[in-house]
Amino acid sequence: MNDWNPILYEKFLKERTLPAKDLLSRIDIASPQKIIDIGCGPGNSTKVLFDKFPNAKIIGIDNSKKMIEQAKNNFSKIEFINADISTDEINYENEFDIVFSNACMQWIPNHHVLLKKLMNMLKQNGILAVQIPINFSEPIHKLIQKVTTSDKWKNKFSVKREMYNLSQNEYCDILAELSSDFFMWETTYYHVMPSHSSLLDWYKGTGLSPYLNQLSEPDVNFFLQEIFEGLTEIYPKQKNGQILFKFPRLFFVAKK
């Protein structure tokens, strides 16, 4: 298995897009001319921006070729670029009115450097808007950590999944150095999932992908079965058989 799977990602598109809409609702800027969406995935967050600002020039970038291909298929009127924001291939300066990033930064190291780069991409008085998952202390992530570091599986993974989130206090310190006008908040979403299988599918499209990419097909099936069995133990069914999936996220908006 290679790259991200847009089809799996889009299976829960409504739930994944809601934080982008919530982030956009806190951006106070009139008639932006140019916007960039960092880590646009299959274009769902970029479409949210396009619907709000149809007259702006909007660019979506993502380091996944499959995600960019899907985004181009989904939204032909928007420009999408396959590129990695953490490298020098993306080197805009003073160019955008809005730099937007929804559920992407957790995959990118060196947030001190990254946030400075994103702010440098903004025009004066431009807005940086970011949402980052902060659910890594939730039961599902503890389960993934337990399984992937077990004697049975640890030697299968030469590359470990890493999340590069900083603490809220660290983000506050960084933003204070970059902006005199910023605010932060958290929102916890409670997604009602139809079943444990649907919860597994959610993570097959995101958090489990770095592990699945390293396994042979037979191993993929055994690995997913072990994760599934763990999910049935840590997420009890509601009375109607559904699963309540808690997902906290951190947001911040900063003006240049």
PLM feature segments, named:
Residues 1-33, 44-48, 67-70, 74:
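Conserved class I S-adenosyl-L-methionine
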Residues 34-89, 113:
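Class I SAM-dependent methyltransferase SAM/SAH-binding core
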Residues 42-44, 160-256:
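Conserved Class I S-adenosyl-L-methionine
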Residues 90-99:
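A short acidic, Gly/Pro-enriched loop at the edge of an enzyme's catalytic core
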Residues 98-111, 134:
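A short SAM/SAH-binding and catalytic strip from SAM-dependent methyltransferases
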Residues 108-109, 122-124:
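Helix-to-beta-strand junctions that scaffold the AdoMet/dcAdoMet cofactor pocket
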